[in-house]
Amino acid sequence: MFLIKVKTIKFQNSTILIKNFFKILFFLFIISCSSNDYNTEFPNQNNDEEDENEFAEIDYGLTEYGITYQGIDRDFSIYIPESYTHDSPSAMMFVFHGFGGSNDMIMYYSDFNSISERENFIVVYPQGSSFWGYPHWNVGGWTNTSSADDIGFVDFLIELISQEYNLNQNRIYATGMSNG
């Protein structure tokens, strides 16, 4: 849990501050109620009889994963639209949250899941590392105290997801908010 510093500002009507405070508390309550259950491996990873031409059984909808990359526990979610098949290569979109955000938050307010259903592409929501107590992406510059190799993490995810789903390697895209 983290604390939110509330700066007191004198208003003629203090109900504005109180309403915003309760909105923030409600939002934090909703986030804290979310489940942390996630898969630690893809369905086909432990298959002793792997066939290089055979993809995993399709798990439509949203699936959350947790992995360790370069000694750091990392999370990501994948959304597979109902229209996806292994028969034709699919585009993939990475959606990056901003500084202090989360993959769950950007998924909810970006609405890429419904867009992927309409346009038939896979969506990946990676979670940034949290070296200062706030999730963020190591983009150099002002985040230079972060030692996370986020470019390597994304490359690793592309490789990992390509093993399970038929991706068009020429149609891998990224979007994000702020630090994402």
What positions do the PLM features span?
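Sec-dependent signal peptide recognition
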Residues: 19-27
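Alpha-helical and His/Cys-centered functional microenvironments
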Residues: 16, 49, 101
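Short intrinsically disordered, low-complexity coil segments enriched in acidic
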Residues: 1-2, 159, 176, 180
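A domain-start/cap signature at the N-terminus of enzymes
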Residues: 33-92, 118, 151, 171, ...
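N-terminal secretory signal peptides that target proteins for export/translocation
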Residues: 1-18
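Serine-hydrolase catalytic machinery in alpha/beta-hydrolase-like enzymes
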Residues: 69-77, 87-173
